[in-house]
Amino acid sequence: VTSYTLNEVVPLKDVVPEWVRIGFSATTGAEFAAHEVLSWSFHSELGGTSGSQK
């Protein structure tokens, strides 16, 4: 069994619009294979001006 790991930090605000959907896709060509996402992490911070909200 061969195992591969992909780890990448991407500043999404620089490459995608404000509203976006993220998905995964994989292929091996003509052969059958199973692809599993074993771990997924997402962190988001709201930007904007400081001050009280009404």
UniProtKB/Swiss-Prot annotation:
GO MF annotation, one: carbohydrate binding
Lineage: superkingdom: Eukaryota
Signal peptide: none
Keywords: Lectin
Keyword Chaperone: no
Pfam families recorded: Lectin_legB
Family designation: Belongs to the leguminous lectin family.
Subunit structure: Tetramer of two alpha and two beta chains.
Protein's name according to its UniProt entry: Lectin alpha chain
Lineage: Eukaryota, Viridiplantae, Streptophyta, Embryophyta, Tracheophyta
